[in-house]
Amino acid sequence: VLKDGSAAAIYGTRGTNGVILVTTKRGSAGKMSVTYNGYMSISSIANQLEVMDRDQFLANGGNDRGYDTNWMDEITRTPFSHSHNLALTGGTTDFNYRASVSYRNNQGIALKSGFNEMIARFSANQNLFDKKIQIAYDATYRRFDREGENSSYDDYSAFKHAYYYNPTAPVYDETGTIDAGGYYALDIQGYSNPVAYIMQRDRRTKGGLFQGSARVTWNILEGLRAQAFGSLKYSDINKGTYTSREVFNTSSFGSASRSFNTRFNKTLETTIDYVKSFGEHHLVVLGGYTYE
């Protein structure tokens, strides 16, 4: 933890309230070991907002479309999720490492929603010249895929339609008289068939990250230490939306959009510090330079 003048000197206004330096899991000396952990789970909605059923709807003057539909049940499911992590560690006192790969797949409670990602990490520590020089290496690679992103365009809107849509309307247009891809999709008081709303629209976000860094520590003299840290970070985000041409009351051509963004960051930090105790006094001197 860096605070007071030392944080501001190196990190500028970003370090006004202090800086916390985080170290992730690292390797240790010893024989190579392999570990695995994972889990599987299912989820459910603990509580649902109470809405009128068919009988209550009709008793309050609603139009009877001939069916008894629970729209919340139609647009939700019991999702299955699982996660896996495999790690490899080993090395000697002069060089040790840790490598891991993890995968996570979470189904969403709403239809056509979910998230999955893969993360690979590598870290290593190296000691040179009887630990006068220490080097720490880190690298991370991540890819993710999100479907049905929670926003006003997707899940939340579908839930809102499910709360207000006619509970006597059918899910599907069995007569085929409505040109809406087989769904019953007549607007009722400004709301649409929630199932059609989800199934005839797609929203997907894919992206990734690569980050690599190295930290070199030089123990010059007792109490005097110099450090240099450099990192590269690249990320990309690819977003796409699609609306079927069969969506009721929309353009016969449908619609689609796509956006792609990338970011590249470089960081260089150098510090030198001196720590010395004089009887009851303790002296700490720190100087540094940061480029980003």
Describe each region flagged by the PLM:
Residues 11-16, 113-116, 151:
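Short, glycine-/polar-rich solvent-exposed loops and beta-turns at beta-strand/coil boundaries
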Residues 28-69, 109-110, 119-209, 229-292:
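Surface-exposed loop/interface segments of Gram-negative outer-membrane beta-barrel transport/assembly proteins
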Residues 83, 115-121:
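Transmembrane beta-barrel architecture of outer membranes
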